[in-house]
Amino acid sequence: MAAALARLGLRSVKQVRVQFCPFEKNVESTRTFLQAVSSEKVRSTNLNCSVIADVRHDGSEPCVDVLFGDGHRLIMRGAHLTAQEMLSAFASHIQARGAAASGDKPSASTGR
């Protein structure tokens, strides 16, 4: 998990909304993700990004909704994901969005 946290940043992210019901049993990974994204070190990578914690008491499924600057949206349902899976998916999408914004092709699509 340390590797996923080391490359975590909010450079191409416009908004992160984390929604969960704290009384459900499957919210630990979503809360860990929120804690990682809300840290001062990560938030300092993009001061214009808003991180919103939407805590509800309705038994809803934990969900992370990420809106990127280019309009791309990443939605992760946290009920069956670990915190490391969520952080690595988030980091890989940020890397892909950064490569798309700079005009480079992602390194995974180098085949002919």
Curated annotation (Swiss-Prot):
The keyword Hydrolase does not apply. It holds the Pfam family MRP_L53. Belongs to the mitochondrion-specific ribosomal protein mL53 family. Component of the mitochondrial ribosome large subunit (39S) which comprises a 16S rRNA and about 50 distinct proteins. This is Large ribosomal subunit protein mL53. It is found in: Mitochondrion. The gene is MRPL53. One of its GO terms (cellular component) is mitochondrial large ribosomal subunit. InterPro entries: mtLSU_mL53 (IPR052473), Ribosomal_mL53 (IPR019716). Keywords: Mitochondrion, Ribonucleoprotein, Ribosomal protein, Transit peptide.
